[in-house]
Structure formats: C-alpha cells, structure tokens
C-alpha cells in the first residue's frame, strides 16, 4: 500500500509554473496547500466602523471561508461552525441573529428531500454592500496618506 504524502511533500512535488505569491512566501507551500480565505482589508481595517465585535467578525470570516463561488452562498452547518469557533451554540445563534439584524447576512433555511430542516444558507450580500459603501472612505484615506508621504519626501515641490 503506497504511503500518503504529507502537505509539504505534495507542495514540493508541484512544478514551479509561476512566481510564488507573497502569502505563499510568508507561510510556505505546505500551509498554503490547504487553501486560503479571501478577507477584504476593508473588513479587517473597518471592523470597528462596521460595528462588529470580535465574535461577529470571526463568524463572518468563517462564513467567507466556505464561500467559493459568488453564485453559491455558503451553507455550513452550525456544528461545523462550532467546531471552528470557541463559543456555545446559544452564543453562535445570538451573534448570527445580530448579524442578520444589522444587515450583514440573510439566512435561508434549507430542507432535505424528506422535508427535514437542513443547514442554513448564508447570503452575504449585505456584507458585500456594506464593504462597497466603505470603499470610498478608504480611497480618501489612502489619498491623504499618499499626499502626506509626497509632502514628506518632497517638501519643497
């Protein structure tokens, strides 16, 4: 029976076709072989402005990690979320209700073929809208930083 390859061995066996991303250079191919989650910097830097507490932020990041296709919203089970988060089911449910009330997400209950309740589908269009609304503020702040940098580098220009 062949021996399973480790993440490191698989990553090293992959032919070098492209230059490694900065993320891959930081974390290495073994870590990156398990994938990554795209988290917009506006979400990270704007957490306070968005009114997100740490638990809510972490829940959103977990949901983002399940969102692979823009046309297919994530639908992790509460059990899967709880395996990743250090909180009780009651606390998770409260934070999800709060995120829904704040307009970050919308839940849609799935049902199985037998008519039983399945996991929720989490529509994150509210989060996307809120981040797009914040983008101009971040553009302005970037322009101000650039102007200050230019002034420092060329004070008499």
Locate each region found by the language model.
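Charged low-complexity intrinsically disordered patches
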Residues: 1-30, 126-157
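Short recognition helix of helix-turn-helix/winged-helix DNA-binding domains
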Residues: 1-84, 90-91
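Generic structural signal for residues positioned in beta-strands
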Residues: 58, 121-123, 157
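Winged-helix/helix-turn-helix nucleic-acid-interaction surface
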Residues: 90-148
């Amino acid at each position: 029976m062949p021996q399973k390859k480790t993440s490191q061995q698989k990553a090293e066996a992959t032919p070098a076709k492209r230059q490694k991303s900065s993320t891959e250079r930081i974390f290495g191919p073994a870590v990156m072989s398990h994938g990554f989650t795209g988290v917009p910097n506006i979400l990270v830097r704007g957490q306070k402005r968005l009114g997100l507490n740490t638990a809510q932020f972490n829940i959103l990041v977990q949901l983002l990690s399940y969102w692979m296709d823009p046309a297919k919203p994530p639908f992790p089970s509460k059990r899967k979320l709880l395996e990743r988060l250090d909180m009780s089911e009651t606390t998770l449910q409260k934070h999800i209700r709060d995120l829904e009330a704040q307009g970050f997400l919308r839940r849609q209950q799935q049902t199985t073929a037998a008519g039983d309740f399945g996991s929720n589908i989490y529509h994150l269009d509210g989060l996307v809208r809120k981040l797009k609304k914040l983008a101009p503020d971040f553009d302005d702040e970037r322009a101000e930083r650039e102007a200050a940098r230019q002034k420092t580098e060329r004070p008499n220009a």
